[in-house]
UniProtKB/Swiss-Prot annotation:
Remarks, miscellaneous: Required for replication in 'nonpermissive' cells, including primary T-cells, macrophages and certain T-cell lines, but is dispensable for replication in 'permissive' cell lines, such as 293T cells. In nonpermissive cells, Vif-defective viruses can produce virions, but they fail to complete reverse transcription and cannot successfully infect new cells.
UniProt free text on domains: The BC-like-box motif mediates the interaction with elongin BC complex.
Organism: Human immunodeficiency virus type 1 group M subtype B (isolate LW123)
Keywords, comma-separated and alphabetical: AIDS, Host cell membrane, Host cytoplasm, Host membrane, Host-virus interaction, Membrane, Metal-binding, Phosphoprotein, RNA-binding, Ubl conjugation, Ubl conjugation pathway, Virion, Zinc
Region span, RNA-binding: 75-114
Name by which UniProt lists this protein: Truncated virion infectivity factor
Taxon lineage: Viruses, Riboviria, Pararnavirae, Artverviricota, Revtraviricetes
Superkingdom: Viruses
GO terms (BP aspect): viral life cycle
Region Interaction with host APOBEC3F, annotated ranges: 14-17, 74-79
A cellular component annotation (GO) from this entry: membrane
PTM comment text: Processed in virion by the viral protease.
UniProt induction comment: Expressed late during infection in a Rev-dependent manner.
Amino acid sequence: MENRWQVMIVWQVDRMRIRTWKSLVKHHMYVSGKARGWFYRHHYESPHPRISSEVHIPLGDARLVITTYWGLHTGERDWHLGQGVSIEWRKKRYSTQVDPELADQLIHLYYFDCFSDSAIRKALLGHIVSPR
């Protein structure tokens, strides 16, 4: 049997941004309560040695899984230091990877309603839009 490789997109991220992400997730899960239903998996709960953490975010009947990695090969810049993030959208047996911009839009669509319903229309018309 021959080897089969699966390629996964991992975004190289500064470790301080990963720490900020983890603390932001924990704040919204345990303090503000805006992240109801989110599940945080620590590195010691994962069988994979490179996984630093996983956050499972329910989006209707699907979910977004954000996995942080450590110990990867260093990137082009010194500050990468082998840290990375992969973002996956899963629904039943189907999964696909998404980019950080789409993940941000999905999370804000379901959990953080920052603007009123008419904000998009006002923005398109050139009016100033402010959060609630």
